[in-house]
Amino acid sequence: MSNKVNQGKRNATSEDVAQLAGVSQATVSRVFAGGANVSEKKRKKILDAAAQLEYKPNAQARSLITRKTMMVGIIMRNIRDPFYSAVLEIFHTRLSPLGYQLIFNNSENEIIEEWEIAKLLEYNVEGIIVTDALLSEGATRKLKRSGIVSILFNRYAEGLNSSAVYCDNYLAAQQIATYLVEMGHRTFAFISGPRNTSTTVDRLKGFQEVLWERKIKDLTIIPGTYSYESGFESAQELLTRNKKIDCIFCGSDIIALGVMDAARLVGFRIPEDLSVVGFDNIRMLGWTPYPLTTWEQPLEEMVTSTVELLLKEIDDKNAVPRIIAMKGRLVIRNTVRKKK
């Protein structure tokens, strides 16, 4: 009996692989399901046969065998922000080689609602990553009841027993404030993201504490959104009525870009009349005409740690949630002046 397999245009099956490798179809299934009870010699023969036939195991069939869907949900706001699109790209880069598929939901809401979590759960995801966003009480309850692994990225939250990975925003804001004070600034504004996120709360706390220690009380706080429009509109209104502001700390680089455009429109030169600091160090800063001083978040490391926690908790339902705060660094360019 010939071992030749019909290699026409149809897709190869596990039966074809078994025939070419000279093993049973059950053995082929065990190899692609991650089974351990297969010798290395047989495993190599099966993988070589699969490569020769360009065999791709059916994901749905594999999930029935392993009881794993190999799907991870990720929910975020404002994908138009280059920071979040970079985050999504890095998550895909980390998870795809491991065989995981990302199910992405871009929320248009300031607060993630219960139905948005429910939508991801319909895909039988093994875990959900929630980026810098607030969860409604209903969404929090839905996650808890589902028993699905959930990891918070770029924030943490009280009341949700989940692991979290984020940049140490408190420390970052302290270092930014210290630098600005040492550069001679005394009249500040902080244009932030949404008011109640851990990100905004920690940055404001760290920034204010440094100013208070230096007996500086002149700080205008403007909550906003992480958008160009928020930065532009906030700065235009602020600088029109208060010409004494000499430094604006922005909750994101995109906010900072809006701030600088508005400042120029109302007659401020940067950095001669107004210093501006961003947050994130997005890639586009390398090719914009704005050499923005900013805080760089260690995105690659943050995503890697998030994926490691996610996979560990998927495999071990009794794993204890961890909170990981990572340090970034101040990137000094040309939007902050030294005051005499």
Model-flagged regions — what are they?
Residues 1-9, 67-178, 182, 240, ...:
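Alpha-helical recognition/docking segments in bacterial nutrient-uptake
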Residues 1-69, 337-340:
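N-terminal helix-turn-helix DNA-binding module of bacterial transcription factors
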Residues 20, 25-30, 64-80, 179, ...:
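Short beta-strand segments enriched in small/hydrophobic residues
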Residues 24, 70, 126, 186-187, ...:
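Short acidic/polar active-site loop segments enriched in Thr and Asp
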Residues 49, 90-94, 142, 146, ...:
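Alpha-helical structural signal in soluble globular domains
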Residues 76-86, 104-112, 155, 165-175, ...:
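Hinge/beta->alpha junction and helix N-cap segments in small-molecule ligand-binding domains
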Residues 219, 241-340:
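Flexible loop/turn connectors
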